[in-house]
Each structure stands twice: as C-alpha cells, then as structure tokens.
Amino acid sequence: MRSLFASTGRGLEELLKTELEHLGAQSCQITQGGVYFRADDKTMYQSLLWSRLASRIMLPLNEFNVYSDLDLYLGVQAIDWSEVFTVNHTFAIHFNGTNDVIRNSQYGALKAKDAIVDSFQRKIGQRPDVAKQSPDIRLTIHLHKEKASLSLDLSGDGLHQRGYRDLTGQAPLKENLAAAIIMRSGWKTDTPLIDPMCGSGTLLIEAAMMATDCAPALNRVHWGFRHWLGHNEALWKEVTHEAFARFREGKKNTQARFYGFDVDKRVLDMARANARRADVADLITFTQGDAAKLTNPVSTGVKGTIISNPPYGERLESEPALIALHSQLGRAVKAHFPGWRLSLFSASPELLSCIQLRAEREFKAKNGPLDCVQKNYLLSETPSTINTRLAEDFANRLRKNEKKLAKWAKQQQIECYRLYDADLPEYNVAVDRYGEKVVIQEYAPPKTINEHKARQRLFDVISATMEVLALRSDQLILKTRQRQKGKQQYEKMAEKGDFFLVDEFGAKFWVNLTDYLDTGLFLDHRIARKMLGEMSKGKDFLNLFAYTGSASVHAGLGGAKSTTTVDMSRTYLEWAEKNFQANGLSGRQHRLMQADCLQWLSQSNEQFDVIFIDPPTFSNSKRMENTFDVQRDHIELMKHLKRLLRKGGTIMFSNNKRGFKMDHEALANIGLTAKEITQKTLSQDFARNRQIHNCWLLNHAGEE
C-alpha cells in the first residue's frame, strides 16, 4: 500500500473523499485543498485515470524540517534518486512556500535541484537535465513554516486537462470543477441535460463522459509516472483496457441526451470540436440561441436538468444586461420546463436572485480566486409566466411617478426628466429618463451598509425598473454617484462616443449617457434655462462654469444679442459647440472660451446684461490656483460679477450646496440685492427634492 495525496479545489474536498473511497482508496483523510489516502498500485492507477475531481495525485517521498538551506539540501538528498528515475530523463521542481530561511521559492527550487544533481553525480558520475517545460519527472516541494514535504507528481500536467479541450471561450471552467458542479446538481445520468449558455461545452462534455462511463483521463497522453522507476506498465495497461471497455459499453447503452445553446457561433464551433475529441459529439446537440429565449427541445413529459455557469460581469455597465439575462432566463425556465431541475453556478449570488426562485440547496466553491455559489432549484410542475416582483415598494412608486410625469413631460415638450429621486430611503437611487433611455444613478451607500445588501438592492432596483418601464437592457445605463475630486468630473468613464439629441422646450441638446459621470444636461436647471432664454432677448449674455453650454443655447434661441460661454474644460466646450450647431446658432456673436472661470472673472472688463453662474460647491482642481468654497467665497465672487454687470442687468446665481445661506448684509455693502427664486425653478419632477439646488436673482442696489 502506498500513501498518496490528491489535491482539489477549495470546497470540493468532501466530494473527492467520497469519489476516492468509491475507487477503492483506504484511510482517506480530508485536509484543506485535498485528501490523504492509501492505495495499492491498481487503485493508484485507477485514481489517476478515473478521478473527475482531483487536480493532481502526489506520491510523498520525504518530510523534513528546514531550519537552514543545508537542511533543505540534505532533506532532498536523503532520497536515493537513482531509484526514482534514470539520469537520461529530465526533471523539474515546483517549489511553493517560504520561511525565515528560504525566503524565495526560486532559491528553494535551486537548492533542491542541486541536491538531486549532486546525488546522481556522486553515485553514477552523471547528472540529469532540468526541463522547465514538459519534464519527464515533476517533483513538488511544499514548505510551511519549518516543515517541508517532498512529493513525486504522478499526474504530470493537472488532471483537469483531460485532453479534449484545446480551445476555450471566455472565462472557462476547469474540467474538475465542472464535474463537481454536475455531481452537485442533482442530475440523473439517464435524463436530458441542457446548458443554455454552454460556451466551449465543458459542463455538457463532462456530463456526457459520466453518462457513458468514460474515464475522464482516458484521452490523456502525458503522465508524470511514465518515467518513474516504480511504474508498472503492465498494470497500467490492464487498468486502461478495462476503462476503454467500460466506455464502449457505456456509450452503447446510454439513453441520455445533451443540449447546448450559446449566442456566439465561434464558441459553439469550439464546443463541437471539444466534443469530437472527447468522442461524445453524437450525444450533444449544440445550437446557436439566446438563453433569454430558451425553449424546451425535449419531448413533452420528459424531465431533466438545466445547468449553467452564467456570465457575472466585472464592469458596472454590464450589470443591466446581466440582470436582464438572468430575469429572462428565470421566466423562460418557469414557462417551458415544469418539473425540471435547475442548477446555476455563479460568482454573483445577487444576479442569481434575479431568477426569482427559492433554492432548495446551495454549495460553495472556488473558481480560481473567485468565491462562487451553486444553487439548485426545483421548478414547479405548473408552467408560470408570472414573475414575483422584486423591490415591490420601489416598483409601485416608479410606476406611479411614470404615469404622472410622462403626460406632464409631453405637454411641456421635454424628453428628459427625473422619474425617481431616492423617494424611499432603502432604495437610494435616482432614475432619469432621456428619451427612450433611462439612467439609474446609485448614490454611494454609507460604509455602515453591508456591501452585499447594497448590491442586492441595486440589482432589485435595476430589475424592477426594466420591468416597470418595459426596457431592453441596452436602454438602461447604470452610474454610481459619489463626490467628484479634482479632474474627475472631466475624465472619461468609457469610450463609446454614444451621443444622441434630446428636446427641451424646443431646444436640442446632445447628451451622452455612458462616457462621463454626468450626461451633458443638468435636468434640475431646466426651468432656469428657460427663464434665461426669456430674459436674454436683445441682451449680452454671459455663462460661467458653463458645462456644455445649454443655458447659452437657450439664451441664443431667446434672441440674445451675444453669448459668451466660459468653462475650463475643452471637452465640454467642444460639446457646447455641437449644441450651438444643433440649434442653428453660429457666428462671432456666440463665443466659446476655455479658461479658469474665477481667474477670467477677475481679469475681464467686459459688460453684460444677463449673467448666469452655477459654480461647483467646492473645487480644488489643479488647474485652479486656490480652492473654492461657494459658501465661503460667494461674496468675493459677487464683487467680480457686479463689476461686469451693466446697469439694469441681472445675475442668476445657482448652486447645489445644501443649507446655503446668502450673506445679504455683505451683498448690500457691495451694492447688490438678492431675491431667492428656488421654488420657481423647481419643476414637477424635482418637487420631491426641494434641496436639489438653490437659485437667486441679483441686481444692482436700487434696481430690483
């Protein structure tokens, strides 16, 4: 009997222990990442050939303490290496772990290599060669604190490499993890199995190999034991011949059928090639198709299992599409697969919640560095087309707001308006409509809120919004709103360049919902812009901190004699120029100026009749010499504005600072008066948030 160790993925140890015991292993003991066991040579070979779950199977050679690099050298040299492999064969050492003495794994591997080479040199006067790629003998040393374990890797390459998969789609599952998912799914080998997002076909191929009693490593060519002097070739041939016979018989007798769907034709071609190499292609039907439109390819009355590893998404912008995919998959399986089993493996339990089913069992496992969950569901015997709504309170409020505001917006000739603005504290988002598209802005949750809970609520909101507003996934854009720092407000978030025109009181504006944190149009200033248009006929108009120049466009359309648009961002000024062009405004009377607004204001001597200024609440941009705080600095700001304001002129001053207090006394001292008009500038869609901005009209004293 030999002492052996089988490694596996985290979370699969118990499954591996059961599998090894079924293969005849004895004295199985679970440890983190694997199972120690004892086996005779036949069981050892069967474990290598038949284990669907093991990553590698090792033959321990020695254990020793390492208090110095000499201890490592002597511990490795204690083995008579001429009895392990011949000098004509290459070897490699995989060293992992460090301690206070061996602080570098490469150094550890080098010392171990020296020990083996010196051992051969002393005994037979020759030395074997090291081969980092495809060595004949692969040795592993694991060092933990002072304890080192030295093993011969009987597998060679990892056992997940079955030999059938040369090409893979994006983010493939390792074959041994796929096998574990199938084992845990509740699938019975004589029933149909469907993967609606099959990718390169790994789950279906592994299942087909189980159904046909095919040893998972039957197609492997390279093994780590081939040049080991303890290898029994006759016994190995006996074990493999038995396996081939079992596969022939199993393939002849299986009744199981497998169905794979994917939207990517290229990946399906890979899947078909993989299935051919595994010799199970005749059992699997691969079809190009969308999981969201999944229907049942199996005869009525036959029940099987749907299994999949759906995409989970790393980028924020992909989440609406993934939420839609999971929601639509949930509807499809409930409608077309009564009485079937469903098993989904994912790195995102929040996305799985969009299926809107209660799992009867859950398992945890690692997929590389990712913490994943597998959820098993039993679908109702009664087909259902009704979805239980997530975030019901939010959905009801959104539905009510949409009904009220859509009619109002049409009457007002506006295409962009706010549908929801954190009306309910537990759903802390804003929902804005831009024509046929909708933007959800998530306000960054407090650190006290559990991250998974916040993410789950956001997913519920997205799912409910898509359902209530009947949106396709490409019509919904997700943003996270947080405090802007430095140049962040000017930096691109994406490179889509997806601009489209929207209408506001007859003015046309280009908006971009994806590339920047903001969209190009501040919706809460809509009425203020309209007022500026009405105030500017025949007047010289100045727009400071102008953003994309929408207020200037309204002034121009309102008949302004001239418009001057000042902003520090070249990007936004180019955007403003497009807005002018979209409205037929051109000529030297419409100036666009790139400048630090505060610096420009302090240096300019021009005169204007109407001035609009909407400064940031706070700014410490590197392109500004000093910091700016709107509460602290608004009087200094007004001093400069007064100098540029003609007699009889008006300043419209707006800002977003909550609790802003105008210093009327200081204003009077510089010869200005101010009247708050905030309530007049709040339109119906912002009536629920009266602190979205504050707005003032200022005039020279005695002219109000």
UniProtKB/Swiss-Prot annotation:
SMART domains: THUMP. Its EC number is 2.1.1.173, 2.1.1.264. It is found in: Cytoplasm. Its main location: cytoplasm. It is an enzyme of class 2 (transferase). One of its GO terms (molecular function) is rRNA (guanine-N7-)-methyltransferase activity. Signal peptide: none annotated. Keywords: Cytoplasm, Methyltransferase, RNA-binding, rRNA processing, S-adenosyl-L-methionine, Transferase. It catalyses: guanosine(2445) in 23S rRNA + S-adenosyl-L-methionine = N(2)-methylguanosine(2445) in 23S rRNA + S-adenosyl-L-homocysteine + H(+); guanosine(2069) in 23S rRNA + S-adenosyl-L-methionine = N(2)-methylguanosine(2069) in 23S rRNA + S-adenosyl-L-homocysteine + H(+). PANTHER family: RIBOSOMAL RNA LARGE SUBUNIT METHYLTRANSFERASE K/L, RIBOSOMAL RNA LARGE SUBUNIT METHYLTRANSFERASE K_L. Belongs to the methyltransferase superfamily. RlmKL family. Specifically methylates the guanine in position 2445 (m2G2445) and the guanine in position 2069 (m7G2069) of 23S rRNA. This is Ribosomal RNA large subunit methyltransferase K/L. The gene is rlmL.
